[in-house]
């Protein structure tokens, strides 16, 4: 008879996002007539930190083209952006760092960030610190553009989808080790409830299938079938492969 493991006994409430002191959604401008047919100019007011986010944010002020007021947008800051910088958004904007253009207007090989999946969704791809998207090629007949994502995967997006020229600021953030549990505590408390995480082999057998024994070891294969029962479904679930990659790919000089 199976045991009810600790994760099942623990249960848990509905997750509530840690949004205290967050600065709001980081998005491009709403797509309008000015961006579709020309460009609009904004100025970077300040660069700020957003709790729980690795990349800094930039507050960019635009004059509203239809009403007598100033609209302040929150952009994901690109590397090299500074306060007082002019940012141009639109089809006819120049190809300089920080400007927002449709991907179809940029040449192949351009490095961009915060790219839209669909025109007008205000940014979805390449948004974390140090990340960027590379334009691979354009298909004029279908109006599509092929881009390379930070993961290395290729994706096809509409040529009318917008992106910010340059890479996201804050690169190299993970190069500095945390070193202390206190730093990890403060890092994850503003993100989500995912730290600390106890290993299964450190538990008792009543708490986890990997627990127990006179020394810490699993004692059986860690791969489990997809159809495993709850409480048994721990470890490498329905793994296609396990272990280290053996051998090296042949490289032509």
From Swiss-Prot:
<keyword id="KW-0539">Nucleus</keyword>
<keyword id="KW-0699">rRNA-binding</keyword>
<dbReference type="GO" id="GO:0003735">
    <property type="term" value="F:structural constituent of ribosome"/>
</dbReference>
<keyword id="KW-0689">Ribosomal protein</keyword>
<dbReference type="InterPro" id="IPR022669">
    <property type="entry name" value="Ribosomal_uL2_C"/>
</dbReference>
<dbReference type="Pfam" id="PF00181">
    <property type="entry name" value="Ribosomal_L2"/>
</dbReference>
<dbReference type="InterPro" id="IPR014722">
    <property type="entry name" value="Rib_uL2_dom2"/>
</dbReference>
<keyword id="KW-0687">Ribonucleoprotein</keyword>
<dbReference type="GO" id="GO:0005634">
    <property type="term" value="C:nucleus"/>
</dbReference>
<dbReference type="Pfam" id="PF03947">
    <property type="entry name" value="Ribosomal_L2_C"/>
</dbReference>
<dbReference type="GO" id="GO:0002181">
    <property type="term" value="P:cytoplasmic translation"/>
</dbReference>
<comment type="similarity">
    <text>Belongs to the universal ribosomal protein uL2 family.</text>
</comment>
<dbReference type="InterPro" id="IPR008991">
    <property type="entry name" value="Translation_prot_SH3-like_sf"/>
</dbReference>
<dbReference type="GO" id="GO:0005829">
    <property type="term" value="C:cytosol"/>
</dbReference>
<dbReference type="InterPro" id="IPR022671">
    <property type="entry name" value="Ribosomal_uL2_CS"/>
</dbReference>
<protein>
    <recommendedName>
        <fullName>Large ribosomal subunit protein uL2C</fullName>
    </recommendedName>
</protein>
<keyword id="KW-0694">RNA-binding</keyword>
<comment type="subunit">
    <text>Component of the large ribosomal subunit (LSU). Mature yeast ribosomes consist of a small (40S) and a large (60S) subunit. The 40S small subunit contains 1 molecule of ribosomal RNA (18S rRNA) and at least 33 different proteins. The large 60S subunit contains 3 rRNA molecules (25S, 5.8S and 5S rRNA) and at least 46 different proteins.</text>
</comment>
<dbReference type="GO" id="GO:0003723">
    <property type="term" value="F:RNA binding"/>
</dbReference>
<dbReference type="InterPro" id="IPR012340">
    <property type="entry name" value="NA-bd_OB-fold"/>
</dbReference>
<dbReference type="GO" id="GO:0019843">
    <property type="term" value="F:rRNA binding"/>
</dbReference>
<dbReference type="InterPro" id="IPR002171">
    <property type="entry name" value="Ribosomal_uL2"/>
</dbReference>
<dbReference type="InterPro" id="IPR022666">
    <property type="entry name" value="Ribosomal_uL2_RNA-bd_dom"/>
</dbReference>
<keyword id="KW-0963">Cytoplasm</keyword>
<dbReference type="GO" id="GO:0022625">
    <property type="term" value="C:cytosolic large ribosomal subunit"/>
</dbReference>
<dbReference type="InterPro" id="IPR014726">
    <property type="entry name" value="Ribosomal_uL2_dom3"/>
</dbReference>
<comment type="function">
    <text>Component of the ribosome, a large ribonucleoprotein complex responsible for the synthesis of proteins in the cell. The small ribosomal subunit (SSU) binds messenger RNAs (mRNAs) and translates the encoded message by selecting cognate aminoacyl-transfer RNA (tRNA) molecules. The large subunit (LSU) contains the ribosomal catalytic site termed the peptidyl transferase center (PTC), which catalyzes the formation of peptide bonds, thereby polymerizing the amino acids delivered by tRNAs into a polypeptide chain.</text>
</comment>
């Amino acid at each position: 008879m199976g045991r009810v493991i600790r994760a099942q006994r623990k249960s848990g409430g509905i997750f509530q996002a840690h949004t205290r002191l967050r600065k709001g959604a980081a998005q491009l401008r709403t797509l309008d007539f000015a961006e579709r047919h020309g460009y609009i100019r904004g100025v970077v007011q300040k660069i700020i930190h957003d709790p729980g986010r690795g990349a800094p944010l930039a507050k960019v002020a635009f004059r509203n083209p239809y009403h007598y007021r100033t609209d302040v947008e929150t952009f994901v800051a690109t590397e090299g952006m500074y306060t007082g910088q002019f940012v141009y958004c639109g089809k006819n904007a120049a190809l300089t760092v920080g400007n927002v253009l449709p991907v179809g207007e940029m040449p192949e090989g351009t490095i961009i960030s915060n790219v839209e999946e669909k025109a007008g969704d205000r940014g979805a791809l390449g948004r974390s610190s140090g990340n960027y998207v590379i334009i691979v090629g354009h298909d004029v007949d279908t109006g599509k553009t092929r881009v390379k994502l930070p993961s290395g995967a290729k994706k096809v997006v509409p040529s009318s989808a917008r992106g910010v020229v340059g890479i996201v600021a804050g690169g190299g953030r993970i190069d500095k080790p945390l070193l202390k549990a206190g730093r990890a505590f403060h890092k994850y408390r503003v993100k989500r409830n995912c730290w600390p995480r106890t290993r299964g082999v450190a538990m008792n057998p009543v708490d986890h299938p990997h627990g127990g024994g006179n020394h810490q070891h699993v004692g059986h294969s860690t791969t489990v079938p997809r159809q495993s029962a709850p409480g048994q479904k721990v470890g490498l679930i329905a793994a296609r492969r396990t272990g280290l990659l053996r051998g090296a790919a042949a490289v032509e000089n």
